[in-house]
Amino acid sequence: MEAKHLTMGCCYLSRRLNQLSSHDPLWKRHCKKYWLISDEEKIRRNQSWKAIFVSTYSDLGRYIQYYATLKKAWDDLEKYLGQRCPRMIGSLKESVQEEDLDAVEAQIGCKLPDDYRCSFRIHNGQKLVVPGLMGSMALSNHYRSEDLLDIDTAAGGFQQRLGLKQCLPLTFCIHTGLSQYMALESVEGRNKYEIFYQCPDQMARNPSAIDMFITGTSYLEWFTSYVNKVVTGGYPIIRDQIFRYVHDKECVATTGDITVSVSTSFLPELSSVHPPHYFFTYRIRIEMSKDALPEKACQLDSRYWRITNAKGDVEEVQGPGVVGEFPIISPGRVYEYTSCTTFSTTSGYMEGYYTFHCLYYKEKFFNVTIPRFHMVCPTFKVSTARMETNHNEYAVDEDEDSTDTDEYEDRRRVMDIPAPSGRCPHHT
């Protein structure tokens, strides 16, 4: 009798579980949580929530822990670009299928991480065009714009040579040849799935001695952190491009009616670890309040810099104007310019002031504070080839900090900018 009751109870429980599992509203939450399916999309697909979840899971189930995060990042990025850089949207490629990703794994002989695969199930990178999705940087004689590579182009650039063994390029700049790579195996001192800019050891005679500036610990972290900076306004949009200048909100100084703010960027393609030569560019914005009186209009005459490296060494620099110009600032007007500097230490900071004269009272001069702004190079790893090689095999080459940023920039106009595998230009 007890066995009969137990059997009947199990049957009832099974029927109840079956009824619950078919209750469509229960599947709605999972569809929205894991696949970001909207009510509008459900109507368009004309399927039940359960059917949508099951069909999507059968296709993308292996990515369930990544899909919602990456899909939201892509959706946010597309929405933002549609408003701020619409022409960039046209360079994005449609998604690839599982068999395409499997074929690439077979071609390169390495497994791709699931977060990377998941992203390419949403968008297959972009066309090799300018501007690049992964950000730009420009100086008077130097331009970088990184495209997010599609899966086939990335596979074609897969590296097996010493120094970059089993590394897959994620980005590429057609102007500089610069790429960010992802390590598909833990070899040559790299962690698996670590992302980095290559930086040849210029003091080594061994071409496999390649140092690395680290930009991410996984594809998910690398891509979503970049997108977050873009869509929250962390990177400025200049001439319909994403420029990778970082602005510290504390780095603002107001003197009277004039406000000065600074954003900075590290340029890995013009930097090296050996010898220590770290190249930074900075963008300065000078603005006069729109509420200032007309007679407050003034002209910039000169600049003064106090430059301090990580060792505490201080250098003072003075010069006329900025980047060869003597801008006039009037109520509501903004003036922006870009310049650069180098350090032989991994970090440093600059501060100073501009000297202006009033246009209405030509004998009246005053100083405007430039806030202190810090420049720090990314975390880097030294090539294992260096650690394994006799120090006698390394050349001796000393580098110095730049002495005057504007003059340094002028001198660089007559230099050829090398590809990442070349030798970084030095200040002389």
Cite the ranges covered by each PLM segment.
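Short, solvent-exposed beta-strand/turn "edge" segments of beta-rich domains on protein surfaces
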Residues: 266-279, 292-296, 327-331, 343-345
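Terminal connector regions
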Residues: 341-386
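Short acidic, flexible loop segments centered on an aromatic residue
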Residues: 292-314
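Short, well-ordered beta-strand segments enriched in hydrophobic/aromatic residues
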Residues: 280-288
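Low-complexity, acidic Ser/Thr/Pro/Gly-rich terminal tails and inter-domain linkers that flank the onset
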Residues: 239-281
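Acidic, serine/threonine- and proline-rich intrinsically disordered appendage/tail regions
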Residues: 368-428
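Intrinsically disordered, low-complexity Pro/Gly/Ser/Thr-rich segments with frequent PxxP/GP/PP motifs
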Residues: 312-347
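A surface-exposed partner-binding patch
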Residues: 3, 10-13, 19-178
